[in-house]
Amino acid sequence: MSNEPFGPNEWALILGGSSGFGLATAHKLSEHGLNICIVHRDRRGAMSRIEPEFNRIRDRGVSLATYNKDALNKEVRSEIVKELTDLMGEDGRIRVLLHSIAFGNLKLIGPEPPARATARARLAEELGVEETRLTEVADRLFEQGCDGLQGITTAPEYSSDLLDEEDMARTVHSMGTSLLGWTQEILERSLFTADARVLGLTSEGNSVAWKGYAAVAAAKAALESVSRSIAAEMASSGIRSNLVQAGVTDTPALRMIPGSFHLKAQARVRNPFNRLTTPSDVANVIYLLSLPEAAWINGEIIRVDGGECISGVSE
């Protein structure tokens, strides 16, 4: 008799599962016997990295279905759900729906102000060295892990092309409200288990204004609203909806943010454990939220950051 918490006909459907949090979660849940369906959007050149990861999941003896298609397209969504329904068979059901789509716009909403005199310039003057030389040394040491130097390193560069309403709307849909359409379609087809989980990922950027993050922050706020409403209105269908607020994590999505190197440095300095959150840290908590024992957790935002968000301590 298996001690695993998931039945042989139960599945996890992961939107955005070829890297980062989604892939780590696919690995974690498959380790415990959950069948996996991954929807992702990647170029052909990336598949040489992705396919070995998919093979690792298959090697655990679970079923794996993958769709390299646009999860944001309504018709494509319906096609995938239909194909998955046929694949799962009459007894197959979705235990976990994870929204991990990271497709957003990272433009500023206003122009950058002119450069002003900085602490770096004052320090160079006091030391009697050229500011350019001081900057070179600070940048080199910063890249080597001296996080406390971030205030005197070269500032991040941002595009002069500013965010517009269309950029904002696309990002809010892709990283926020698209969860609703997937949840509704799966529910309408009666594909959820009697004790199902709808999960998503948010970040501290939902309440802190990071430069270039305005559209993603709006999307995360929308995602939080959708998750709360699912928790309240779909509980009668056996659905528990929660979000994980991950700490700063070195993922492909983070690296797309201008100034991400500085964000990582700030997080390491601020975190009580002086390290970044990892995708595995987050996947472990998603697994815990998927267990039967977590059935009374509903409508919550769970911080998974080692205390980063609440820490006022720095080195």
Ranges and model annotations:
Residues 102-223, 227-236, 248-249:
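Catalytic loop of short-chain dehydrogenase/reductase
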Residues 240-250, 290, 303-305:
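Conserved SDR Rossmann-fold cofactor-binding beta-strand/turn motif
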Residues 271-282, 293:
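A conserved structural motif in NAD(P)-dependent oxidoreductases
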Residues 29, 234, 289:
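Aromatic pocket-lining residues of Rossmann-like dinucleotide-binding sites
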Residues 287, 298-315:
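Short C-terminal tail/terminal secondary-structure segment
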Residues 1-167, 179, 183-184, 227-228, 256, ...:
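Short-chain dehydrogenase/reductase
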Residues 49, 212-215, 236, 243, ...:
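A glycine/serine/threonine-rich, flexible loop-to-helix segment
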